[in-house]
Amino acid sequence: MNKQDTTLLSANGYSLSLSVFPAQKAKANIMFVHGMEEYKERYIAFASFLQEHGYNVITSDLRGHGKDAPQLSHIADKYGDKLIIQDQQAITKYIETTFPDLPLYIFAHSMGTIITRVLLQNDSKKYQKVALSGYVNPNPASGVGLGLTRLIKVFKKPTGHSKLINDLAVGQFGKAIKDRKTELDWLSYNEDNVNKYIEDPLCGVEFTLASFEALFSLLNQMGKAKSYKDVNKEMPILLIAGDADPCTGLEKGRKASLDNLHKAGFNDVSTITLEHMRHEILNEDNKQKVYEDILEFFDK
């Protein structure tokens, strides 16, 4: 494995932490966008796998995430939704400059799929393929969550926390798992993965109110199919998730995500629903099948 770490100055002077996995004879670039309350090093194994199969992979920590974050799980005091999109635009430009004349793909997971879909609303023609893992479903109630978060933030400040908002955003996922041993069993059937996440000081740190404001704002924007402009209609998009992933909204939510992209104008959207898998499909016991499914999508 060849991995090079670097930093990139983004909007409002924020320093983004990047890892670059250059392939010997690259056929395309793949930009990773990770999920909420985790960090880029959790994707080293999958990034290395894609690197070995001929892809330059670029991973990064979302602002407020990872070991270099000024304050863990705090995206920004304000405008976090806009800043996090500007970060991905800056990374896109970095990749285009560093590895020119190659197709650019995206692999995104969880909250990263929300960010990616908002990114595509204005920039879809910059990318040639997109794979969305553990994709969050459009939720009409996101506007209510956004309003409530903003109200509580007035009294508790941007860096404050709220159990009510945390429960509203992610609390239902744990409750969806019967006979659960922990509140994070929804992450995977793989208990070792769940325990590692719980024990990792860089994982599961509760979002601040300003971060939840950014999350709800992005989720609200993601659901607006009419917000997609100058759509790259024939760009292949893969929606891949575990059949028992509550984050997708299960069967009804998965259909809502598919319908939303079709309404936005994307004609080539495929789905893979994996049996006996939950949210973190890359960390389930049968992760090799997931690796191969995503590789096949990028290769074809």
Question: For the regions a protein language model found, what residue spans apply to each?
Answer:
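Catalytic active-site module of serine/aspartate enzymes centered on a nucleophile-bearing elbow/loop
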Residues: 262-300
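Short beta-strand/loop motif that positions the catalytic acidic residue
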Residues: 239-241
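Alpha/beta-hydrolase fold nucleophile elbow
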Residues: 99-110
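Alpha/beta-hydrolase active-site loop
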Residues: 78-97
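Alpha/beta-hydrolase-fold enzymes
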Residues: 116-202
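Active-site glycine-rich loops that stabilize anionic/oxyanionic intermediates
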Residues: 27, 34-38, 110-111, 243-244
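N-terminal cap/lid segment of alpha/beta-hydrolase-fold proteins
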Residues: 1-25
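Conserved alpha/beta-hydrolase
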Residues: 42-72
